[in-house]
Amino acid sequence: DIDHPDIEEFIKWKVTEEQKVASIVTGSKICSNHLKSIMSACHNCEADGESCFEPSKNPALKREIIAARRNEVPENYIQRIIHFAKPGYKSVEFETYNTDWDSEAYVTVSGQNSNNSVRVTDEFLDAVMNDKEWNLVNRTDGSINKTVNAKELWDQVGYSAWACADPGIQFHTTINDWHTCPESGEIRASNPCSEYM
């Protein structure tokens, strides 16, 4: 319900989770590329022995470390690869991910097996049209938890639906105005796509 006290977090939930996927995919590829370059710089150097693993004595290694740091590769991974290269290891496995909906990246985030909807009332839509405040109401005692701008809340719904296709909208007032058996009680939910409405 659009007046639920947790509605803002609910609206943004899947957007945030999909942003995590983008971060996992991008971060894995950035780390993989830089770590391989650091490993290569350790072994393809003109210095002798241990000097190949010291950035002050191996200019190529220094360049690769600087490039990795610029791209936010964690320092512990940079150092780990250098230590891994010292005993002679020449390659490293660093798994990368993709944005396929059935990929490991999507499996690691929440909300991907849900189809979320927000139920909006005519009262809320009027508040949006008239740029009014909207109360988010506690479910346990009916008290006002927070007051937000209705138009801004509606904009959050629109942005989230654009960014990740959720939440869908269920028009609570209209659904119940068209209820074919109102004696059975108010319709409070449907499948998120609302084919049955």
Where are these regions (language model features)?
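Active-site cavity-forming subdomains of large catalytic enzyme subunits
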Residues: 1-197
